[in-house]
Every structure is written in C-alpha cells, then in structure tokens.
C-alpha cells in the first residue's frame, strides 16, 4: 500500500500535465466519446505528423490571415522549446520565443517563431544536429540560410520547420550574439515595451495580409516594413542602453 501511495504521489498533477501536453482529451464523457476523439486525433494529426516526418515535409500556414492574440501562445512555445532543448542538449546556448506570437496583445499568423542559439553556426550544419532536430519534429528547410539586413548585407541562419499539422512553427537557428540573433530579441522587446510601435506593426501586417494572401508573398512584403522600422528600433535600443 505504501508503494502504491508513493507512486500516486509521484504522478504529475493536472496543471503539470496541461503544461506538458500538446493535446488533452477529456475522459469525463462516455468511453465511446473518448474513442471517437482518439480516432479523430490519430487521423487528423498523428498520422499526418508521422508521414511528414518520414518525408521531411514541414507544415506551413495556408494563408497570411491574422489571428487574434492567443494567450496560450507562450505556453505552446515553451513546450516546443523544451522539446528542442531535450533533443539538442548542451549544443544549445539559449532558447527564445520570438516573433509576433511572443508579444502580448499583438494579432499574428498562428505560427510560433522560435530562436535556437548556438555558439557557432557551423554546429547547426552537423549531421547529428540536423537529425536530432528532425527526430524532435523540426526538419531542415533547404535554401533558407540568411536574413536580409537593411544595409544590403545578410545575417546567416538556418531554418527548421515543424512537421506537426496542428502546430505550425518556425525554428530560426542563429549564433548567439550575432546581428540576426540580437535583432530578433530587440524587436520583440521593443514591441513589448512600446504599445504604439506594437499597434503600428499590427496595422501594417493587417494591410499587407489583405493584399497578399499567400504566406510567402506576405513575408516578402514585410521586408520593406522591417527596413523602415530598423531606425526606430535602433533609436529605442540606444535609449535603453544609455
């Protein structure tokens, strides 16, 4: 009896289970209802996940449509980051939730952007690194190896995408302290700290999404806005550091 009580006491409570689970199925209904929910989850998410993992195909947002701010985005990001951290171990220096879904009260495409920091970007090209991220559900996206800087230069990175059809996510792998790494963090912090900047970005995204329904075209169209915002971000950064 004591052994049984110890096992029960060691079990995760409901809050811990919710924090760790991508999906929760309510078993308060009938066994038939639960079986139906399990079958639906299997067919709509688990089977497509496995097939995409085998083929190396990432999930992508169907459109550029903006979703209302979702208070669960940070928790979803935390689960994904924990999975990545477990897969990569000490090869990772830092893990960050970035992009619009990391900014409270900001409408966004329902796509979680994550930043994985490494000591040197060459580490991200190692076969084991790529394979371990893929095994965790994040496959390498070929042909995406940099961001464009305002001055015409490029900021190296690697991109991985989630294969989960129920959670589109982009994983940006950058060297910690590189210009691209710092810009992503500073941009997030600027929008969190400055409601006017956040709302201006929201308005710009809504206007661009109305003109560019394709996600790729929408992302390309945002480049000009980012170039225009770069000076304002640098001004904010300088004021914060002074």
Q: Which residues does each predicted region cover?
A:
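Small-molecule kinase domains that catalyze NTP-dependent phosphoryl transfer to phosphate-bearing small molecules
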Residues: 1-49
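Short, flexible turn/loop "capping" segments at secondary-structure junctions
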Residues: 16-18, 56-62, 105-109, 164, ...
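Short amphipathic alpha-helices in soluble, non-transmembrane regions
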Residues: 39, 126-137
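Helical scaffold of the NTase/Pol beta-like nucleotidyltransferase catalytic core
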Residues: 40-96
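Active-site nucleotide-donor binding segment shared across nucleotidyl transfer reactions
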Residues: 81-127
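Conserved catalytic core of two-metal-ion nucleotidyltransferases
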Residues: 137-177
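Catalytic cores of NTP-dependent nucleotidyl/adenyl transfer enzymes across multiple folds
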Residues: 173-242
């Amino acid at each position: 009896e004591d052994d049984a009580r110890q096992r029960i006491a060691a079990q995760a409570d409901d809050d811990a289970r919710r924090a760790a689970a991508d999906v929760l199925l309510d078993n308060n209904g009938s066994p038939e209802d639960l079986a139906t929910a399990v079958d639906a989850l299997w067919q709509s998410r688990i089977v497509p996940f496995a097939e995409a993992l085998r083929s190396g195909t990432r999930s992508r947002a169907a459109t550029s449509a903006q979703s209302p701010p979702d208070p669960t985005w940070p928790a979803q990001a935390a689960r994904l980051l924990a999975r990545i951290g477990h897969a990569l171990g000490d090869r990772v220096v830092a893990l960050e939730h970035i992009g619009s879904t990391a900014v409270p009260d900001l409408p966004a495409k329902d796509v979680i952007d994550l930043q994985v920091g490494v000591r040197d970007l060459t580490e991200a090209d190692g076969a084991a690194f790529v394979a371990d991220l893929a095994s965790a559900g994040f496959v390498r996206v070929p042909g995406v190896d940099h961001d464009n800087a305002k001055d015409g230069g490029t900021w190296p990175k690697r991109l991985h995408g989630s294969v989960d059809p129920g959670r589109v996510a982009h994983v940006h792998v950058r060297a910690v302290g590189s210009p691209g790494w710092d810009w992503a963090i500073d941009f997030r912090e600027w929008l969190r700290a400055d409601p006017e900047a956040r709302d201006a970005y929201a308005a710009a995204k809504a206007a661009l999404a109305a003109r560019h329904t394709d996600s790729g075209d929408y992302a390309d169209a945002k480049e000009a806005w980012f170039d225009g915002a770069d000076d304002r971000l640098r001004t904010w950064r300088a004021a914060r550091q002074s």
